Amino acid sequence: MSELDPNRVVLSPAQKARRINQNPDLYGTFAEIGAGQETVRHFFRAGGASQTIAKAMSAYDKDFSNAIYGPEPGNRFVCESRLKNMLRHEFGLMLERLSRKDHPTKKFFTFANTIASSTYERPHSGHGWIGVRFQTAPDRPTSDVIIHVRLHDPDISLQQESVGIMGVNLIHACFFHHKDPQEIMTALYDNVSRHVVEIDMIQMNGPDFSQVDNRLLSLQLVKRGYTDAVIFGPDGQNLQASEALYKKNILAIRGSFRPVTKVNIDMIMNGYNTVSYTHLDVYKRQGASCPLE
């Protein structure tokens, strides 16, 4: 049963993995780096994984990871760009190495995650990116679902277990609920508590989600209590706040902005000028150049 809908039947991770393994047309690769090497284990333990899993790998060493997927700006590893590069690289290898003549009915997929668990020095720092690139028909272009999670369980092993279950939920939802984005969001928390895993960003792209407004998905995250705040860009694409604001100077103005008025513009410009002058004065006293100049 679901905590949101008592009448909704919730499958266990083993049941979901087994359902995928028993489908002869689903075939894919798993790439899990960092602390998130738990998802594929559910598929191996469910039985029948040989007809589902083309490859399972973990480029755990940072140098090896960079050699495979390329370095990221700032030499980061747990970031959205790394996840997207993993999905692109691994799915590309499937198309390159598997002949469509030999697999005419297969619907390919790639699951990837890059996770940093909490440490004793930073007990609430666990977070990561999880994503699936998949086909809903053999000749259909791929669609992507990407989420960012924050891990709040104090036990590192339980953080990893939660990530593994959520990965199974995501793969299962992409294949069996791709026509209902709301159900995908609901299914992500099957057998996972919202108190231990927080989803603060979700993005659905591709032909199977051509009618999806990702901004509304962001608002759903807040409405459902999955997270406290969300951010999206002017292009309508959802952003993960710490990723989008990484090493940025931030000026925030409260308001509805419907429409944007001259008063709103004046507030922004006066606020910016105030912050700029304050920072400029501080940097000059320190004998350094101000990044806001």
Regions found by a protein language model. Give the residues of each.
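Non-catalytic propeptide/linker segments at domain boundaries
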Residues: 179-240, 245-246
